[in-house]
Amino acid sequence: MNTLPNKITLCRIVLNPVFLILAYQGLLLPAFVVYIIACLSDMADGYIARKYNQISNFGKFMDPLADKMLVLSAMCFFIESGQMPGWAVAIVLFREFAVSGLRLIAVEQNRVIAAAWSGKIKTAATMIALGAMMLLPSVKFINIIAVAAIVITTVYSGIEYFVVNKDVFTEAK
């Protein structure tokens, strides 16, 4: 746990409440800066872990959890501010729980379902879309495009996880 990538992941988790406090205080530019730092730290911890062979079980679990915490916190803020419809967040939550359930079934079979490229694209698209919504909150067109990008990449990646790993269900007992 004392690796640099794990420390970066922990910092991202700590940045989450800082982001929320700033956003809910109406300090959107500072909240945006914290959000961008958190997003960039997501890229940094993964890069460092791979480059210096510091991949850990802690990082495999906490890194995606930190991403979900940040993204879902931003989405909750956008629901409350009227920038994002609740149904879009419900789709994201459904996909996250469904893929997590799929991974749990796979673990029972001593299998690991690695992150798919579509999942990485979904995370990047979501982080960029939410950042755009934060930076330009009054531009409705940006909100519409951002929500569409989030929903489309979320649904696509969720379907791909289940199609590629459908054999998990045939082996389930």
Identify the residue ranges that each predicted region occupies.
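Core segments of transmembrane alpha-helices
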Residues: 11-18, 64-75, 122-131
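Helix-loop junctions at the membrane-solvent interface of multi-pass transporters
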Residues: 21-25, 80, 105-106, 132-136, ...
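N-terminal membrane topogenic signal
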Residues: 1-11
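Juxtamembrane helix-capping/reentrant segments at transmembrane boundaries
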Residues: 1-2, 45, 49-70, 106-122, ...
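Membrane-helix boundary/interface segments in integral membrane proteins
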Residues: 95-111
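Membrane-embedded alpha-helical segments that form the functional core of polytopic membrane enzymes
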Residues: 15-58, 74-94, 140-155
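C-terminal membrane-associated helical module and adjoining short loops/tails
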Residues: 2, 15-16, 32-40, 110-173
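Active-site His/Glu-centered metal-binding helix of metallohydrolases
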Residues: 14, 40-48, 65, 69, ...
